[in-house]
């Protein structure tokens, strides 16, 4: 996946400034940086969910939007209307819709895919619950299940571990590593320094501009972190 000169601005204020990099296929890549660095904006800009001032994102010489059906997106929980009357099962079933198109409705095959995805995140017992009745960790598992039901090749996740229980985080991380091992490409906005080395193959260190990008052991260094965070207090945790 190639990102070339990506620039994004809100109300004439630059949020992402001329970012160019290449994300490796079949890797777990984390986007790391201080608050306000543009991490979520970069993720959304790559998918075309926010307007770009300039730049392009391509895969196999085609715009990333061309591959929309092969891309699964897990948003931040705050972006989801939890009052919407939809059950856990139906939420996961939505993951099968991209492959169906506009006319077809989910059948037996799609329902089995949704059930299998719920099994993987250990949420079958909650299938008839309304999504608004779930805890943060349970809801995040459901979002992951929806992505699994899509059978995507590329997964974008925006702060999937924020405010969830440790058991849910461990289960989700195990699933992401399994997807990676099966050749899927996964990009995660992340904030916990202590887990970067354990979770990711590569990282994108960002502060509106690209500070560094590459394998964790080469990129997640004290010098580069200090450059990204400036005077903000940061406890260096590479290798932890």
Curated annotation (Swiss-Prot):
What are this entry's molecular-function GO terms?
ATP binding; ATP hydrolysis activity
Native organism taxonomy: Bacteria, Bacillati, Bacillota, Bacilli, Bacillales
Show the GO cellular component annotation of the record. plasma membrane
- The entry's keywords: ATP-binding, Cell membrane, Membrane, Nucleotide-binding, Transport
In terms of CDD domains, this protein maps to: ABC_Metallic_Cations (cd03235)
Q: What is this protein called?
A: Manganese transport system ATP-binding protein MntB
> Which cysteines link up through disulfide bonds?
none
Q: Does the keyword Flavoprotein apply?
A: no
Under the heading SUPFAM superfamilies, the entry gives: P-loop containing nucleoside triphosphate hydrolases
Where it sits in the cell: the answer is: Cell membrane
UniProt cross-references to SMART domains, sorted A to Z: AAA (SM00382)
Recorded hits in InterPro entries, A to Z, give: AAA+_ATPase (IPR003593), ABC_transporter-like_ATP-bd (IPR003439), ABC_transporter-like_CS (IPR017871), Metal_Ion_Import_ABC (IPR050153), P-loop_NTPase (IPR027417)
Which positions bind ATP? 33-40
Summarize the protein's role.
This protein is probably a component of a manganese permease, a binding protein-dependent, ATP-driven transport system. Probably responsible for energy coupling to the transport system.
Principal subcellular localisation of the protein: membrane
């Amino acid at each position: 996946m190639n990102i070339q000169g990506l620039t994004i601005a809100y109300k004439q204020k630059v949020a992402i400034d001329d970012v160019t990099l290449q994300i490796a296929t079949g890797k777990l890549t984390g986007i790391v940086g201080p608050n306000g660095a543009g991490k979520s904006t970069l993720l959304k800009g790559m998918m075309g969910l926010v307007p770009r001032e300039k730049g392009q994102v391509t895969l196999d010489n085609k715009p990333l939007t061309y591959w929309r059906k092969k891309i699964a997106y897990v948003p931040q929980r705050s972006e989801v209307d939890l009052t919407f009357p939809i059950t856990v099962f139906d939420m996961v079933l939505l993951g099968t819709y991209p492959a169906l198109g506009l006319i077809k409705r989910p059948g037996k095959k799609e329902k089995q895919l949704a059930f299998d995805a719920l099994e993987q995140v250990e949420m079958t017992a909650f299938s008839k619950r309304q999504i608004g009745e779930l805890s943060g960790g349970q809801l995040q598992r459901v979002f992951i299940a929806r992505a699994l039901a899509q059978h995507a090749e590329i997964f974008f996740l925006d702060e999937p571990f924020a405010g969830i229980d440790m058991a849910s985080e461990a289960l989700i991380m195990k699933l992401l590593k399994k997807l990676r091992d099966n050749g899927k490409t996964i990009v995660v906005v992340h904030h916990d320094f202590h887990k970067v080395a354990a979770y990711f193959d590569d990282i994108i260190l960002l502060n509106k501009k690209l500070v560094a990008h590459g394998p964790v052991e080469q990129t997640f260094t004290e010098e580069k972190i200090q450059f990204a965070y400036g005077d903000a207090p940061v406890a260096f945790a590479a290798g932890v």
